[in-house]
Regions:
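Acidic/histidine-rich, surface-exposed loop or edge segments in extracytoplasmic proteins
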Residues: 32-42, 127-130
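Bacterial N-terminal signal peptides that target proteins for export
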Residues: 1-9
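Surface-exposed short loop/turn segments
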Residues: 62-68, 72-115, 120-137, 141, ...
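Post-signal-peptide N-terminal segment of Sec-exported extracytoplasmic proteins
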Residues: 41-72
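Bacterial signal peptide processing site
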Residues: 21-24
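C-terminal motif of bacterial Sec signal peptides marking the signal peptidase cleavage site
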Residues: 15-19
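Short, solvent-exposed mixed-charge patches
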Residues: 162-164
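Sec-exported extracytoplasmic/periplasmic mature domains
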Residues: 56, 60, 147, 151-159
Length: 164
């Protein structure tokens, strides 16, 4: 007896959701084709290079198509010591990566500007190579998180532009 009621409730919920005009963000017409036509400009640094790679992956950039949008970014990276050992050496760092970006239509028009911040922590190692590897790993994780946040922001902004 309970199972038919649950099925009927689920069916009516889906019917109401379809009736309200709900469109999945990545459904047709969606924003995925638009995201893949955004060219990315980053600062000429190692972190900038990693951000370009991460953004091109997140946006699924299609090199075979002409870019409709241009994304310009500016990076601010701050590293802060968090913990100290009894011998007053740092045991952990916090890395804060702030990416300010501007999305502009190639054909001209109003730009979309915003910023995202990604915060990660990593352990400070005693060996020099391990310390460098830990810092780079932290930078890569921060860049990946910033690229994901930018994709989400751009998806939302472009979906709002496509609304009638």
């Amino acid at each position: 007896m309970i199972r038919p009621v649950r099925i009927a409730a689920a069916f009516s919920a889906l019917t109401m959701l379809a009736a309200c005009g709900f469109t999945p963000l990545y459904g047709e017409p969606g924003v995925s084709p638009t995201l893949s036509r955004i060219s990315v400009s980053v600062p000429d640094t190692r972190t900038g290079f990693e951000l370009r790679q991460a953004l091109e992956d997140e946006l699924a950039w299609d090199r075979g198509q002409t870019a409709l949008w241009r994304l310009e970014t500016d990076l601010d990276q701050r590293r802060t010591p968090l913990g100290r050992r009894v011998d007053d050496t740092v045991s952990r760092y916090e890395l804060v990566l702030t990416v300010r970006y501007q999305l502009t239509p190639v054909s001209g028009g109003e730009a979309i500007t915003d910023a995202v911040t990604a915060t990660v922590t990593y352990a400070a190692a005693d060996q020099a190579y391990a310390a460098i590897a830990a810092q780079r790993d932290g930078e890569q994780r921060a860049v990946a998180e910033a690229a994901r946040l930018i994709r989400l922001d751009l998806s939302r902004a472009l979906a709002d532009l496509n609304q009638p």
